[in-house]
Amino acid sequence: MENTGWMGKGHRMTPACPLLLSVILSLRLATAFDPAPSACSALASGVLYGAFSLQDLFPTIASGCSWTLENPDPTKYSLYLRFNRQEQVCAHFAPRLLPLDHYLVNFTCLRPSPEEAVAQAESEVGRPEEEEAEAAAGLELCSGSGPFTFLHFDKNFVQLCLSAEPSEAPRLLAPAALAFRFVEVLLINNNNSSQFTCGVLCRWSEECGRAAGRACGFAQPGCSCPGEAGAGSTTTTSPGPPAAHTLSNALVPGGPAPPAEADLHSGSSNDLFTTEMRYGEEPEEEPKVKTQWPRSADEPGLYMAQTGDPAAEEWSPWSVCSLTCGQGLQVRTRSCVSSPYGTLCSGPLRETRPCNNSATCPVHGVWEEWGSWSLCSRSCGRGSRSRMRTCVPPQHGGKACEGPELQTKLCSMAACPVEGQWLEWGPWGPCSTSCANGTQQRSRKCSVAGPAWATCTGALTDTRECSNLECPATDSKWGPWNAWSLCSKTCDTGWQRRFRMCQATGTQGYPCEGTGEEVKPCSEKRCPAFHEMCRDEYVMLMTWKKAAAGEIIYNKCPPNASGSASRRCLLSAQGVAYWGLPSFARCISHEYRYLYLSLREHLAKGQRMLAGEGMSQVVRSLQELLARRTYYSGDLLFSVDILRNVTDTFKRATYVPSADDVQRFFQVVSFMVDAENKEKWDDAQQVSPGSVHLLRVVEDFIHLVGDALKAFQSSLIVTDNLVISIQREPVSAVSSDITFPMRGRRGMKDWVRHSEDRLFLPKEVLSLSSPGKPATSGAAGSPGRGRGPGTVPPGPGHSHQRLLPADPDESSYFVIGAVLYRTLGLILPPPRPPLAVTSRVMTVTVRPPTQPPAEPLITVELSYIINGTTDPHCASWDYSRADASSGDWDTENCQTLETQAAHTRCQCQHLSTFAVLAQPPKDLTLELAGSPSVPLVIGCAVSCMALLTLLAIYAAFWRFIKSERSIILLNFCLSILASNILILVGQSRVLSKGVCTMTAAFLHFFFLSSFCWVLTEAWQSYLAVIGRMRTRLVRKRFLCLGWGLPALVVAVSVGFTRTKGYGTSSYCWLSLEGGLLYAFVGPAAVIVLVNMLIGIIVFNKLMARDGISDKSKKQRAGSERCPWASLLLPCSACGAVPSPLLSSASARNAMASLWSSCVVLPLLALTWMSAVLAMTDRRSVLFQALFAVFNSAQGFVITAVHCFLRREVQDVVKCQMGVCRADESEDSPDSCKNGQLQILSDFEKDVDLACQTVLFKEVNTCNPSTITGTLSRLSLDEDEEPKSCLVGPEGSLSFSPLPGNILVPMAASPGLGEPPPPQEANPVYMCGEGGLRQLDLTWLRPTEPGSEGDYMVLPRRTLSLQPGGGGGGGEDAPRARPEGTPRRAAKTVAHTEGYPSFLSVDHSGLGLGPAYGSLQNPYGMTFQPPPPTPSARQVPEPGERSRTMPRTVPGSTMKMGSLERKKLRYSDLDFEKVMHTRKRHSELYHELNQKFHTFDRYRSQSTAKREKRWSVSSGGAAERSVCTDKPSPGERPSLSQHRRHQSWSTFKSMTLGSLPPKPRERLTLHRAAAWEPTEPPDGDFQTEV
């Protein structure tokens, strides 16, 4: 059990009741039961002061029980105990104290029996004195006679034992004895006693004096009790360092001494205790005491002083000089431990002083920075520039500077001016003196004949001497010259002037001889030209004034920072001045300055715990500031200083940072060394080598964390830019070799897992230095607690050299730290040119320092971050060099073993920071971001040109090739074009963080959209194959799939990641870490799989019987079909496509889409995969070349498949060129006229289909669909399959709902005059150019009521041409017959001509010809068509125009296209919208029956065996219904009129009824082998109409 308390709160366990306690004690004593240690022992820690009784200390009050008190730090604290004598406790339990170095849980305190004592005495014969002393370490508390016994310990643990025999203990103690507080404990700081501890000691001394009759003294430093000035008082002095290395454990007062002599002495005033002490014996008067002194926190091998400010710890000894030669620095620190009863600490916690070593360091010669380029040597024409640098001379045998001192280069200025001519000299001026000799001057002017800026060669003025009268003698003299004035010009030869005064005045003339003024030229350098001056500029809220090239201008920092910014005016190679980048190395943001002030406030706190918690808050705030990524280069240097103070404070306060604090600390370092800060670090290097200081801070913090670890414990910290491994191993038993990094650890970053960097540290390297040999590194000494006998305290002459122990203690540990930096090589000071850091940087640090092996054993493998380098060298960082800013890489410590394409292996001798130095390629810069590479530009440009060509062709012929497939293709091309443009934009190095993030997000969107549009094309082909009509809703779904699905994926990814991972410092694409890349790879893979599935389904559909137009393939496939399915109805010109069968155009388009997906989709996947690799790894030329090849091939393939190989585009181009097919009629939807492609719109196709469709209806067969069902499928559900053709039970026919390839097997008809069976007589609707007509067979059978599905929806005004003869409309026309009313068997002419809107039968011709099949009459009867009459074509109805244009009519109207003529033909059609209600269907059905025209008059032919072409045509379709046989000229009109009134039975007898029921004599209609119907119209017919 462990108990912690404050101010007396120790472990306390009160028994439930005295009766229960007595029962337990009696049982244990009766059976001689030894109590279990877990139930009889207690451990207390953290007790500063307390007074305890038996029931407070022991869980179970019994003999053998123990109570152990822990000293938190024996080097700094001491335990003071006062034992208050109580007779019952002493008599029954004989308490004694045992000072222990280690706590033993199962240790028993029972006194050994006499037999065991004898055996123990025999075993102790021959034991050394140390073991005897340890055996006699127990102190009997009741051996003295006084009321108090004082004890002083500096051990780790003090154990209080009840050591009496069980038989001697009573069954029950008195309650007063149980509650008597017989032990008082006080924990005192040896060097900083608080007021409370001194007050307790003073009270003890006062009580001791009252009991003894005289004063008692305590030799405790820093404590003084009031009233101690008497003679008997003990003065308090500070003890010096111990004179001996090993002292005894404790001091107790002598047994026989009187109570008045019970004084407590400190460890420094006692002699060695060498006599043996056994149980029951009195201790000697001079017992021995073992004292341990506190050590320095920074230097564990040195002892700390014990004098100084009582409110703070003493200063530690000065550390070893930081340099082995020359002038270095020494540091000493102190920490403050304050209790609530003490005062706060004041003053600094760290001091630094310079130190000079006797050894002189060799100083190599160092070049200073190059000076600025001089102005051109000539003001015009071609000259030269030069610049110089100065070499700091070497000292003490250092190397001289290498390299040139002067550099020159050519310069070209403006053309030199034309030399002018001097004019005549002017007159001489006056003499300069009035007496004696003087000078005269004259001048001349330059005549400029050329440009205004031409000059003349020669002097402008001329001077000569002049003689005057002698000056009179005077006694005056000149005074001293004053200082020269400022130059009148800063350049281009100005002048300076100085004066002197005449000190005396003569009687006549000028008082002094000579002149009192002197003038001399100055600033002879040429003034910079206009192009050599930097203009005024306003950048970042700062105004930079104009300056000449080479000058540095200083300015205030931006408003959000304090300090000064600088900027240099530079000169380009062409001689033009320009401003360099501003330097903000001396600018510090307000937030960072406030954070530093809060750091100072935490440092001012005296208590360690508060200071440690304050540092945790500082690290948390610093992480939040750096995460914003808005800071200056000066903020980075300031952050390094903050981290150094945090590390020192953690170390001084002995505060163990938590795991979160450690993670935040290294996360801050990761933010600072990020590659985005390379330019900031380059700027900061001009002021201070902050990256080198950061490297040292990281190493110190690693060892701070490692000291808090347990033995064999390790810690791994992983961030975006560095990986840290920390482990603690005992010095005497290092477990195994060290390998770093462990790539298989959980949480490891991808850049570490895939890297080839490796460290191998054999355990032979981990050995301490030999005795007396100085340490070889600046690491701290061994963290052992005690000083071994082989160590010697530092003397005055060896204060800066630390000696390691010869035999390390078992408690000494190695702290091994390894760090792999991802980007540190970019920010460390670079080596001398032409070398550069071409690998990652790895740091290895071990403390205490190890002995360097005789040969290199440390193996390091470092992978390259720059490809194409040459001459690699392994190097280590050398801290001993004086100037760290010039580059401290040392290549002599490591050997380069092996160089491969991906990494280099090194072997080094010393532990340090390692890297590979090599010469980078000449055409490679170390910039992580730059302009796009040439392969990327070529690939994107070729692909964009191909796609733009495709878009231009489609835009030119859009009205001819507009379709769903074309729209999908255009969206697909736009997504690829946008992707190529964004790839090029993302490679630019001028993008900001926000623009790069947006570029990555849009790239993600367009990459996914390109895949989705390929999937949309597959979906469209699938819908075309299954024959489902695409409504506008389906088209909107196309857009949702193509653009909506990628937008949803990108929105979800951005929302979850908060744009983290969209764009990195190296590229503008999805980050390869964190799993964000799966947001693109996952959907793309799913789309590819779904596309493959749809492709397989479409292919199976096309290979089925309805999807193959080739008859041979169908026969091989063994599919059965209706025998009449290969025939075509006479209305093939309508362009209708049968709904249950797939048209050849749809099959062709579906096959083209399938083939396009199979070719484009794999190429698209390869292109974007290579694009991702090329963007993420710019150094790889292979990936960029692959992307260029795949991207170019993708553009060409898309253009070829969808443009050059597409049939629609080919037809458009042919028709534009005038190459048209001659076998197509004028009215064909795909025919060409006058070089133009005549393509019907969806509306005109619907009208053409409605007017030229033939519908066969039968009672007991399939339910035929309406035109509404044919066009828009409104009457059928979308998922309902169309009905197939069937054969009736008696051989009757059943057809598909709409026109198709139908073969009509004609059954045998009854004889003439016999009525046919009603079930075999079906109403026949024939179509012409003007509309539909019904061959009325109602006189053979009554018409049955038709269902709502047995009708066709036709326009209200189907025909507007009226017959030329009588029988017009008007009131005499019969009304429409109600549905279901039977008609009479015969009809008169009046009945036939009673419909005003239809043509009578005399305007139609019925013929049999080769076009629609042949018919042989076995009875020798012929059928003569009626002669043409000028009824419909020549006599139009008043107010209505003709529907057709004869081909023989000349004029400009013939030049109209077929499209215009069809629009004219259907211009006055008024279609009603189809409704989904039964009422509207019924009305349309009745209207349809009213407008059908009935055929009742036909003429007979006299010729028996003549082949006839028969057709039913309206007057408006004469060009396609011309009979092959013309009537004889002599035929009488009466005969024609008679034949016109012939009944239908006669016609049936001569034609259909006369054929025998043999297959070879069946009526054969025109086959569809040469007919290719157009595609079914897309869209909703009801909505479009």
UniProtKB/Swiss-Prot annotation:
Residues 874-924 are annotated as: GPS. Keywords: Cell membrane, Disulfide bond, G-protein coupled receptor, Glycoprotein, Membrane, Phosphoprotein, Proteoglycan, Receptor, Repeat, Secreted, Signal, Transducer, Transmembrane, Transmembrane helix. It comes from the Eukaryota. Residues 229-238, 769-780 have a biased composition (Low complexity). The chain crosses the membrane at residues 937-957, 966-986, 995-1015, 1037-1057, 1079-1099, 1122-1142, 1154-1174. It is a multi-pass membrane protein. Residues 33-936, 987-994, 1058-1078, 1143-1153 are extracellular. Residues 958-965, 1016-1036, 1100-1121, 1175-1585 are cytoplasmic. Residues 1372-1382 have a biased composition (Basic and acidic residues). Detected in cerebrospinal fluid (at protein level). Strongly expressed in brain. Also detected in heart, thymus, skeletal muscle, and different cell lines. Disulfide bonds join 321-355, 325-361, 336-345, 376-411, 380-416, 391-401, 431-466, 435-471, 446-456, 487-522, 491-527, 502-512, 534-569, 557-587, 874-906, 894-908. Residues 229-271, 767-806, 1359-1385, 1423-1454, 1498-1585 are annotated as: Disordered. Changing residue 889 to S: Inhibits autoproteolytic cleavage. One of its GO terms (biological process) is positive regulation of synapse assembly. Residues 1543-1552 have a biased composition (Polar residues). Heterodimer of 2 chains generated by proteolytic processing; the large extracellular N-terminal fragment and the membrane-bound C-terminal fragment predominantly remain associated and non-covalently linked. Interacts with GABPB2. Interacts (via carboxy-terminus) with TAX1BP3. Interacts with GNAZ. Interacts with SH3GL2. Belongs to the G-protein coupled receptor 2 family. Adhesion G-protein coupled receptor (ADGR) subfamily. Orphan G-protein coupled receptor involved in cell adhesion and probably in cell-cell interactions. Activates NFAT-signaling pathway, a transcription factor, via the G-protein GNAZ. Involved in angiogenesis inhibition. This is Adhesion G protein-coupled receptor B2. It comes from Homo sapiens.
